[in-house]
Amino acid sequence: MAAALALVAGVLSGAVLPLWSALPQYKKKITDRCFHHSECYSGCCLMDLDSGGAFCAPRARITMICLPQTKGATNIICPCRMGLTCISKDLMCSRRCHMI
């Protein structure tokens, strides 16, 4: 009985069910305004330095500049698309998406 009450309390508090924005059909499209990378279908909420906000952007393609992961809510540079790895082949150059 206690387990059932804990489950109901978790559902009511939103701890058990995922947020609506986490479901793919509710994710934002490219160019939509965002506050967190998890809101975007691409997984990249890029900072817009001109307007001070952020927008959903596509992930980096092969040989494009990238950052391997997001440490905060928004990205400075988007991570690579699926199947690509964000690495630097030269210590003097920035990271880019490569197939490995």
UniProtKB/Swiss-Prot annotation:
Residues annotated as signal peptide = 1-21
Q: Does the keyword Secreted apply?
A: yes
Cysteine disulfide links: 34-45, 40-56, 44-78, 66-86, 80-97
Q: Does the keyword Secreted apply?
A: yes
Cellular component aspect of the GO annotation: extracellular region
Main location group:
secreted
A Gene Ontology biological process in which this protein takes part is: lipid catabolic process
Q: What GO annotations for molecular function exist for this entry?
A: enzyme activator activity
Where does the protein end up? Secreted
Q: InterPro entries per the record?
A: Colipase (IPR001981)
Q: Which UniProt keywords apply?
A: Disulfide bond, Secreted, Signal
Q: Which family does the similarity line name?
A: Belongs to the colipase family.
**Protein name as it appears in the record:** Colipase-like protein 2
Q: Which organism is it from?
A: Homo sapiens
